[in-house]
């Protein structure tokens, strides 16, 4: 990995105003390949036990496949797709013992030792790439309101507060195979910031607000700030919140 930067990172999770936590988040460092890491967020749905079972299964599947992953020889996009495909199958099997059908979103980024980065997501948990405070790329939700945005019927700002913003067009555990979207960053640079987060976070911020917080604050400070501000803005009816932030800080 490039010696021009050092990596700092943080994860955060809060149940918001819900009675129980169905989000899960993790940042895994590869046991055999220094500089290889996987950041992942899963937002479970399906009652008290169903949603948590689903997001737990995402984390278990991701951990198992990441441990087997060999950066020097394996294909990163294929491994990320496999996480989605295998978690989807197992979540559907757990539906038998859950009081509601378990479902989950997934948003994950993989950083290889050489500095390339691969994304995968399904549902409305998001991935962001900022350089400094400038948004470089973010994922497009698999949601009903996103189809309205795509048609020009509503703006992105209106989508955030739309009453049907929680309707997904696909996710893990649904009847249909989940939609899978992937993205590739050939080379990460100093001052790049990556974030994966559930909708409990991104619903409450503009891209510019998020970019400012991520560029000015350390990952730990940004995690605490975004959770605190999202809690405040949700006015007592907030969703679970989860996020993982990785920042590449210049050594100069």
Set out the residue ranges of the language-model regions.
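PP2C/PPM-type serine/threonine phosphatase catalytic domain
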Residues: 1-252
């Amino acid at each position: 990995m490039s010696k021009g930067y050092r990596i700092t990172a943080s994860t955060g999770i809060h149940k918001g105003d819900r009675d129980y936590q169905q989000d899960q988040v993790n940042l895994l460092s590869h046991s055999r390949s220094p500089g290889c890491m996987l950041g992942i967020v899963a937002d479970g749905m399906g009652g008290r036990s169903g949603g948590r079972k689903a997001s737990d299964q995402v984390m278990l599947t991701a951990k198992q496949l990441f441990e087997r992953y060999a950066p020097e020889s394996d294909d990163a996009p294929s491994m990320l797709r496999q996480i989605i495909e295998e978690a989807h199958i197992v979540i559907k099997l757990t539906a038998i013992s859950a009081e509601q059908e378990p479902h989950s979103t997934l948003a994950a980024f993989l950083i290889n030792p050489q500095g390339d980065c691969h994304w995968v997501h399904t549902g409305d948990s998001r991935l962001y790439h900022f350089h400094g405070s400038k948004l470089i790329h973010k994922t497009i939700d698999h949601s009903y309101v996103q189809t309205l945005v795509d048609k020009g019927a509503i703006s992105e700002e209106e989508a955030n507060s739309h009453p049907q913003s929680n309707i997904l067009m696909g996710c893990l555990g649904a009847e249909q195979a989940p939609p899978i979207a992937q993205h590739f960053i050939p080379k990460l640079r100093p001052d790049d910031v990556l974030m994966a987060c559930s909708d409990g976070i991104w619903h409450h911020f503009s891209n510019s607000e998020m970019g400012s917080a991520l560029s000015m604050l350390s990952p730990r400070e940004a995690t605490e700030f975004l959770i605190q501000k999202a809690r405040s803005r949700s006015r007592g009816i907030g969703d679970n919140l989860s996020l993982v932030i990785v920042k590449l800080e210049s050594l100069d």
